[in-house]
Amino acid sequence: MENPRCPRRPLAEKKARSLDRPQAPGKGSESWDCHWLSLPTAPSRKALHWTTSDWARHSDSPAPSAEAHCTTAAAPTPEETGDFLPSEQRPSQDTKKGWLKTMLNFFVRTGPEEPREKASRRPRGKEGISQHPEPLEAAGEPALRKKAHHDKKPSRKKQGHKKHAAEVTKAAQDQEARGREEGLSKAAAALRSGEADLGPARRGGEDSDHQSFLIKVDGTGALDVSPHATGHQQEEELKKPDQDAIIQMIVELLKRVGDQWEEEQSLASQLGVALPNPAPAVRKKSQEKKTSLKRTSKTNPKKHGSEEAKRGAADVSSPEAWPPKKSSFLPLCVSGHRPSISSSYGLEEPKVQEAPSTEAGAPGPSVLPTPSESQEPGEELPLDRASEYKEFIQKIISMLQDAEEQQGEEQPQVQQEEVGVENPAPHCRRKSQEKRSSFRRAFYHKKHTSKEPRRAGAAGAASPEARRPKRPSFLPLCVGGHRPSTSSSLDPEDLECREPLPAEGEPVVISEAPSQARGHTPEGAPQLSGACESKEIIIQKLVALLQEVDGQLGQQIRRHPSFKRFFYEFSDSSLSKLVATLRSQVAHSSKLDRNRARRLYQFDVSLANKFAGSNSHAMCILMGLRDHYNCTQFPYREDQPNITSPKVESPD
C-alpha cells in the first residue's frame, strides 16, 4: 500500500535528487528526514516547483512526456515564483520551505484543506487511503502526486479531462498559497510583537529583524522551538507567580479588614452596654427636681411652686433629706371627693413627723410626750397600727365631708324658704326651684374658693412681710367634691398652726411653722401663741366629741395619741366645721335617745283633746309632747265652759 506521506516518485525525480545529494545536509536517503531549517522573518510568496526546463536538463528521457506537460501546467507562473535560486540549491530549499509552512500551519492552526470537488472526484476504491488530509505536505507535492496519479491511470482519463483537473488543482493551489501567506504574515507579526515586548535585555541584545526561528525535526516528529517561543513561555511562567502573590495579598487584606470590623463591632457592643448604666447622682437629682417643679406648677400656685423649687435646690446638696420630701410634691385633689394625701401615710409619715429636726427652732404644739410618741425614726410601725391609721384618716375625712355637705345644704334651704314665703309659687315651680338649689349647692364651694385667693392677694399686697406665712391659704379646696384639700407637704417643716377664719371670710393667718421633737420636755419649749392655743383647744374639743360620737375612734385615739397630729394638717375653718357637725350629731343623738324613751308613754292626741278637758295642757307637758306638738291647738279656752255641761260624760 502506498504511504500518503511518502508517495512513489518517478525515476527522473530520483535521479535529480541524487545529483543534489552531496550538497544537502541530509542524514538519510531522502532529504526531508531531519534538517536544520532557517526562516527569514519577512514572508515570501515564492513557490518552489520544478519547471519544464529543469525536468529536461536533469532527466535522461529523450522528450518530455504528458507527465511533464501536466507538471508544467500545474506549476505557477513566473510572476508568482519570482527569481529562482540556482538549481543545486532548489531541492533543499523546497524541502525547507515546505517544512516551514507545515510548522507554521501547525502553530497557526490553519492546515491545508483539499477542495470538495477534488475529494468528490476521487475513486471509491482509494477513499480509505486518501480520505485523511495531509498536513505535512510540501509545496511541490501536489504536482508530483498528480503526476503519479496520472501514471497509474493513463487509460481511464482522456486529455480533456486531464486539462480540466489541472485547472482545478491550480485554483486550489492558489487558494492554499493565499491562506498560507496570510498565516505567515500573522505569525511574523506575532513574533515581532513578542520581541518588542521582551526588549533588548531579555533577548540578549539580538536584533529582532535578523533573529531566526529554528526548528529541529527528528524522525519521530519531535520539535524544538527557538528561544522566542521559550521566552514567551518563561514570561507566562513569571507572570503566574505574580498573580498568585496578588491574590494572596488580596486575601490577607480581606482578613485584616474582617478582623478590624470584628474589633469595631465588639467595641460598639461594649459601649452600647455601658451607655444604659445609671447616671450620676447629681444628674438624677436634677431630673427629680424638674419633675417636682412640673408637678407643683400644675397643682399649686406660682408662689408655692417657687418656694418648693428653692427648697428642692437646697436639698440637692443634702441627699439624705431628699427621700422624705418626695411625698410633698403629690398633686392636690382637684375633682375628687377626698383630699390628696400621701400614699404612705400609715407607714412613713408618722416616722417623719416623729423625727427630731433641730434645724427649725420654731415652737410646736404642746402635746405631752408618750412612750408611743418617743419612738426612734428607724422603727417600723406594725401593720395593724398602719391599717388603723388609714381607717382613722378615712373616717375623719368622711366626717368632714358630711359636715361640709350639711353646711352647704343649710344655707340654700334658708334662702329657699325665705323666697317661698314672700312669693308663693305653684307645685311645679317649686320643683324647678329645688333643681336650681341643687345646682347652687354644687357651685357654692367653687365660688367661695375663688373669692378667697383674690381677697388674700389684695390683703397681702399691702404687707409684703405677711405673704410668706399666708402661703398655705392659697391651697385650693377640693373643687369637684365637698372635702377640704389637705396640705400636700407632710414634712415636719410644713406642720403649721393656723388661726380660725374671721367672720368676713378673709384667709387664714398662719403663724410660724412648728417643728419640735416629741421627746423634748415642755419645760424648755417657748410659750405658745394665741393661734396655736386656739387650734389646740379646737383639737381637744374635737377629740372629746369624737370619743362621744364614735367609740371606736375614741379608742383608737386613746391607744395611739399620735393620731392627733393628723388634725394639724387641716385648717381652722375645717376643724371648726367638724366640731360643729359633731356637736349637732351629739345633740341629735341625745334628742333621739330622749324621744325613744318618751315614745313608750305616748298615746293618741285625739284622746287628750276628747277627755282631758281643762287638763290637756298639763297632759301635753307631762307626756313630753311640747317639742313635737303645739299646745295651742288644744281648745283649752273654748272647751272650758263645755266641761260643766251635763251632756259631756267623763270616762270615769
Curated annotation (Swiss-Prot):
Comp. bias (Low complexity): 63-79, 409-422
Biased composition (Basic and acidic residues): 10-20, 111-129, 173-184, 233-243, 304-313, 382-393
Name of the featured protein: Protein BNIP5
Region spans: Disordered: 1-34, 53-243, 259-494
Record field: compositional bias (Basic residues): 145-164, 282-303, 427-449
Designated gene of the protein: BNIP5
Source species, domain of life: Eukaryota
This protein's UniProt keywords: Isopeptide bond, Ubl conjugation
